[in-house]
Structures are given as C-alpha cells and as structure tokens.
C-alpha cells in the first residue's frame, strides 16, 4: 500500500520535473489537507452521513423537495401532452384529401387504389379477367372482391392483403344476381367486425342464400334458399347477420353459424340495402311505400320502424357515418332530366344538407374519418362513370375526380 509519505515524495519528484523553478511547498500543503479530508470522509458510516452537519441536512431536504416537485411537474406536463395529442380535436385535412385511408375502385385497369385526389394511383389487382365490388375489411388489412376469368360465367370470392399479395380464394363457382353485378349497386359482401369472416348472397338452384366464408378459405350457406336471402349486413357486435328475404319483403336475422334465424321486421313491398348504425342500435334500409322508395330506420329488435326521408323522389342506399350521428343516401328525381342529390340527415331524419350532383347517382360512401363522401356519376359527354367527392357539410363544392376508363363499385380503406 502506498503511504502518504510515499505520495509526498512522488509528488515532489513530479513537480520538480515539471516545474523545477517553482517551490512545491504550497501545493504539498494543499494536497495534504485534501487527502486528510478524504480520509476522514472514508470513515463515515451511511447512517451517519445525514448527521454530520446541520447545513447538509437542510441542503439534502431542499434537494428532496426540488426532486419531488420536478417529478410532479413532469407528470402534469405528460398528462397535458396526452390531452393535446389524443383528446383534442384535430383539423380536417384539405378538402379532397384524407389521412384516413385510400379509396379502392374496380375499373378497366383492374382494382385500383389511389388517394382521393387521384395521386398515388396504383393497380392492386391486375385486370386478368373481371374483378368487381371490392370492399375492405374493417381493420383495413384485407380486401375482398368478386373475380372471374372471363366477362361471363360464375364468380369466385377472393381476398388479398393490403399489397395485393396473400391471395385466398374463399369460394368458387358462385352465381351472382344480375343486380349485384351492376356498377351502381352496393357491394354484396359484408365483413365481420373482427375482419376474419365475410357474408355474401349467392344464387343456388333452390333460390338465393346467405353464405359465410372464412378468410383462409371455404364458405357455408347459413340460410334456407326458400327465403331468397339478399343484402346481408353483419351486426357491429358480431352476433348476428341481418338480411332481406325477397319471398316476403321482410328483414330477417340469423347467427353467423346459421342458428336462430327469425323475422326481424316487416316493411311494405321492396326492402333493400340494410346498413347497421355503428352502435348497433338500429338499421337503415330502403323500402317501397306506395311504389315509392324511401329511407327507413329500424330498431335492432325490429319493434320500431321510422320513415326518415318523406320525399316524393326515390330515395335509396342509406349509409351511416362512422360516428353514427348522420345518415347519407341517394335521391333520384322522378324527372330524369333533373339533377340527383345526396341527402345528409341526423339520426331522426332532420336534413342537414342536400348536395346536388349530376344524374345517374350511385350509393354514397363515407370516408373512415367521416369528413368526406364519394359517389359515382355518369359523365354526360364521355358516357362512363367517374368519381365525385362531396363535402357532407355542404361547404366545399363537389370535386370530380377524372378516372381512366369506367369505374364501378368501390370501398374506402381504413389505415391500420
């Protein structure tokens, strides 16, 4: 072990080498004092450190208070940041754009994905045959659509991933009704809330039936073809599927495994396109009254049916906003030379805005963030459908999106 006298001698030698003309005595004295202080402190026991000096106790206590205050301040600032970033309302993106996802269309180029302003346009499913009615799963990770190799013949239900890969054939040899092959009809496919299954209507030799398919492949009929089930809509809680029976123009409900089928509500004449409110409390449907299509809401248990449109024009294809506060539907005037409209109302049917658009209107579709609507309109000059973007508040004018060739049914993708 090196002694203090050894250290003194070593320090003297070093100072002599470095500064031979400077007397080292003053530095030796200062160094001895510091070593002595260090030696005294090395003899402290941990419990004794807080009793060695009254001033030290005050300093330590004050330091503790400052530390606690700093921690509390950080917690408060973190909470305020969370409120600002999560809870505060965010400004909507510029009209015609959305950060909520991409719009997906069936077109002459195959199934195309693009931003609503037409940018970042790319082909998700190549035009190898015919692909129609694309619809995104609720988590935005999978796209289902109908496909066939030629322009005639049976269809296959196909699912792909967000990038168009991981292709699964859910069902083959499916015969769709002519109405469901139309450009201006809602998709006949409905996703389960967990995005693992889908329901659809297909013709069988005995009549139309509702089928449920698994995302990995395979499908099973869950309704009696004698009911001629069409237009399935999967409930938000996943426990039931509502569909329309063409046999009796009634709404029916059935569990996804085919059990518990029962009549939910009876409406007059034609019933079409049921759509669940996001909270599962009610459905919106199109139904004919005195040969006139109107929009109705139906309570989840079928006990309350309310006409929310009350208009002499044909009003159809209702669609709930993502937050369930509004309904949008299409209105076709009796006079074919007149313009069509998209109507936006609250849940009670009180009209918020009526958006005038060109004729041959297709069903309106909400963006996932509820800030936009889109529909298809027939271009009078070119005679093919194009995309029309609408502001549901009626403030900004409609924006027509030019498309290459015909466009048909589409879906708005929610980004995961």
How would you label these PLM feature ranges?
Residues 5, 60-64, 69, 204, ...:
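Intrinsic-disorder/low-complexity, polar/charged segments
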Residues 6, 12-14, 23, 76-416:
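Sequence signature of WD/YWTD-type beta-propeller architectures
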